[in-house]
From Swiss-Prot:
This is tRNA pseudouridine synthase B. It comes from the Bacteria. Gene3D superfamilies: Pseudouridine synthase. The keyword ATP-binding does not apply. It catalyses: uridine(55) in tRNA = pseudouridine(55) in tRNA. Belongs to the pseudouridine synthase TruB family. Type 1 subfamily. Disulfide bonds: none annotated. The lineage of its organism: Bacteria, Pseudomonadati, Pseudomonadota, Alphaproteobacteria, Hyphomicrobiales. The keyword Electron transport does not apply.
Length: 315
């Protein structure tokens, strides 16, 4: 009788590289497609993004490589800034240029009328996501149901708009805005609702994301800058040039308290054990904090009862 074969664990393909790449995503390029491209360019074992950006939108798409994928939730929860253009006179099925026209009006809003409604969309508000959205209804994505011709009731939910600014009204048909908002806000829904309030309908005709906290606009790297490096024939030189654009994994955790620890403490944390925090300078209790040793991220954990208990370890 033959012995059962031992299950072989495949070695992951690619490099075990970690860090954040803050991509300036071009138009007509999906978020999943962008992640696949970056993963291939960097020859990374693992990659993921922190917040979908529609193909018809451009701008910031933070992409996590390797261990940085463990910090994605901290970026997903961050504030976001968008610049967008609303075209008045038409409401569309998708609330952007892609969808068919479902309502229209010859009315056009005066600039002062637009300014007058902005306070209604600032602070904590109730917002109904678009029919074409990733919201799940009875286990199915709303956009899948919408594509099948179903109109579904999507419940309104609480979102927070920190700032909504009218930048310009270049003509009667369009208005440019900037919004700083919290997690779960749909800018397309914002355009739809403002159009309804103004009695003229409206949809997004341009959308660009310029910030996903803690990452700023100056950190963005255009895709063409990265793809141009494919011309470097030497593989090691090419990867070194690409790696220069990576941001340290711990940057995503900048809103949390930081502990600087020694190598012995780092070893204990990596084994899943807590470390004692002694002395007057020991930090107060906190549900989440992160620890670094020699500038490298070691763990995310909880501070309580005079110790740091690891929840996630790195490297």
């Amino acid at each position: 009788m033959s012995k059962p074969r031992k299950q072989q664990h495949r070695k992951p393909k690619g490099r075990p590289i970690s860090g954040w790449l803050i991509l300036d995503k071009p138009l007509d390029f999906g978020s999943t497609e962008a992640v696949s491209k970056i993963k291939w360019l960097f020859n990374a074992q693992k990659a993921g993004h922190a917040g979908t950006l529609d193909p018809l939108a451009s701008g910031m798409l933070p992409i996590a490589l390797g261990d940085a994928t463990k910090t994605v939730p901290y970026v997903m929860d961050g504030r976001k800034i968008y610049e967008f253009t609303v075209t008045w006179g038409e409401q569309r099925a998708t609330d952007d240029l892609e969808g068919e026209v479902v309502e229209s009006s010859d009315q056009r809003p005066e600039e002062q009328a637009i300014r007058d409604i902005l306070p209604n969309y600032t602070g904590v508000i109730m917002q109904t996501p678009p029919q074409f959205s990733a919201i799940k209804i009875a286990g199915e994505r709303a956009y899948d149901l919408a594509r099948d011709g179903e109109t579904v009731e999507i419940p309104a939910r609480e979102v927070e708009i920190h700032r909504l600014t009218l930048l310009a009204c270049p003509d009667a048909d369009t208005a440019h805005f900037e919004v700083e908002c919290g997690k779960g806000t749909y800018v397309r829904a914002l355009a739809r609702d403002m159009g309804r309030d103004l009695g003229c309908f409206g949809h997004i005709s341009e959308l660009r994301r310029t910030m996903v906290a803690p990452f700023g606009e100056d950190m963005m790297v255009p895709l063409e800058t990265l793809t141009a490096l494919e011309a470097i024939e030497d593989r090691d030189e090419r990867l070194e040039a690409l790696d220069a654009f990576l941001i340290d994994t711990a940057e995503a955790l900048s809103s949390l308290p930081r502990l600087i620890i020694n190598d012995d403490q780092a070893h204990r944390l990596k084994m899943g054990n807590p470390i004692l925090l002694r002395g007057r300078d020991a930090p107060a209790n906190h549900p989440e904090a992160y620890a670094t040793a020699q500038g490298k991220l070691v763990a995310i954990g909880e501070i309580g009862e005079g110790e740091f208990r690891p929840k996630r370890v790195f490297g």
